């Protein structure tokens, strides 16, 4: 008899068939309490859980006593109570490698769009404001040869440094929990403390996961240390930044502009002051959102769950100690 799993994300037919070759699959729209209650027997017997963007917490795990592995279609897992999974010897699988290049492309796009005011001037053209040769009121600032400061030198940080160093001749500074010798050797990146990075960088790019240590890592003090000409990019997690402090820094001219893929509350409220600022490029958490990469993420998550329920957790496992 095949193990049973809960699938809470719509998959392409070929990936669904791959799952069904290994498991009895119950598809549900979400993990809300009413959904769990409606499918109580399926949740109670499920050994696997696969999906994205829903909260996986202790209350859910209480309804899933047979659960052995959870697979998230994402690299981040701040919506999952990992400690609760580990305590129950449930492994958590994620998809870190397949989205690296695409997210780095998004960060680079935010840097370019924000610096060159692409969104703002495009909207002005559409509004009929381009009636004569443009002047300084339409100008942006250069990206090439500017100093890039990367906060978080993981896979995505490395991919961004590669683009900046080789493609735009940008000196690279970085701050991370530990020095990254490969970044220093390949991109001549310079490790520095956060204050130094903030004071010297023309672009400050945040690519950090959300943890207790990184929550509101960027607040009024940090923005005050940045150049008034600096551009701030957040492509990590929204709550890493105190959004009210960011809004104040933009309104007061403490920093030049911001490109934001993530926010403290998502979706972003329609009455957020950020939406009325011409020096803000705001996009809806599109970091990995290409057709190709999202398919590859789903395929990776499917394979991760198949492997995990066969005891193979050598790669892409967040908490391998849970299998001990």
UniProtKB/Swiss-Prot annotation:
Transmembrane segments: none annotated. It comes from the Bacteria. It catalyses: glycolate + NADP(+) = glyoxylate + NADPH + H(+); (R)-glycerate + NAD(+) = 3-hydroxypyruvate + NADH + H(+); (R)-glycerate + NADP(+) = 3-hydroxypyruvate + NADPH + H(+). Its main location: cytoplasm. It holds the Pfam family 2-Hacid_dh_C. It is found in: Cytoplasm. GO terms for cellular component: cytosol; plasma membrane. Its EC number is 1.1.1.79, 1.1.1.81. Gene3D superfamilies: NAD(P)-binding Rossmann-like Domain. Keywords: Cytoplasm, NAD, NADP, Oxidoreductase. InterPro entries: D-isomer_2-hydroxyacid_DH, D-isomer_2_OHA_DH_cat_dom, D-isomer_DH_CS, D-isomer_DH_NAD-bd, Glyo/OHPyrv_Rdtase_B, NAD(P)-bd_dom_sf. The active site is at residues 237, 266, 285. GO terms for molecular function: glyoxylate reductase (NADPH) activity; hydroxypyruvate reductase (NADH) activity; hydroxypyruvate reductase (NADPH) activity; hydroxypyruvate reductase [NAD(P)H] activity; NAD binding. HAMAP family: 2_Hacid_dh_C_GhrB. Catalyzes the NADPH-dependent reduction of glyoxylate and hydroxypyruvate into glycolate and glycerate, respectively. Belongs to the D-isomer specific 2-hydroxyacid dehydrogenase family. GhrB subfamily. Homodimer. This is Glyoxylate/hydroxypyruvate reductase B.
């Amino acid at each position: 008899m095949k193990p049973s799993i809960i699938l809470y994300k719509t998959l392409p037919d070929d990936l669904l068939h791959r799952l069904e070759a290994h498991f009895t699959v119950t598809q549900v729209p979400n993990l809300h309490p009413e959904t769990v209650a409606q499918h109580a027997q399926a949740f109670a017997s499920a050994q696997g859980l696969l999906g994205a963007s829903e909260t996986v917490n202790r209350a859910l795990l209480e309804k899933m006593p047979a659960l052995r592995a959870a697979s998230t279609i994402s690299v981040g897992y701040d919506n999952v109570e990992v400690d609760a999974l580990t305590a129950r010897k449930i492994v958590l699988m994620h998809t870190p490698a397949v989205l690296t290049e695409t997210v780095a492309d998004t960060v680079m796009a935010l840097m370019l769009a924000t610096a060159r005011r692409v969104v703002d001037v495009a909207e002005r053209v559409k509004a009929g404001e381009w009636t004569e040769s443009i002047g300084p009121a339409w100008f942006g600032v250069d990206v090439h040869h500017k100093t890039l400061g990367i906060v978080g030198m993981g896979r995505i940080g490395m991919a961004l440094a590669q683009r900046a160093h080789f493609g735009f001749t940008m000196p690279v500074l970085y701050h991370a929990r530990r020095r990254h010798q490969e970044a220093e050797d390949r991109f001549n990146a310079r490790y520095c403390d956060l204050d130094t990075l903030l004071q010297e960088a023309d672009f400050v790019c945040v690519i950090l996961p959300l943890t207790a240590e990184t929550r509101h890592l960027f607040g009024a003090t940090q923005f005050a240390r940045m150049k008034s000409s600096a551009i701030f990019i957040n492509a990590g997690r929204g709550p890493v930044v105190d959004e009210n402090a960011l809004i104040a820094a933009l309104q007061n001219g403490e920093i030049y502009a911001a490109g934001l893929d993530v926010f403290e509350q998502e979706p972003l409220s329609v009455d957020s002051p950020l939406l009325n600022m011409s020096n803000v490029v705001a996009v809806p958490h599109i970091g990995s959102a290409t057709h190709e990469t999202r398919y590859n993420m789903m395929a990776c998550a499917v394979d991760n769950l198949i492997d995990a329920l066969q005891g193979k957790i050598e790669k892409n496992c967040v908490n391998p100690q849970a299998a001990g």
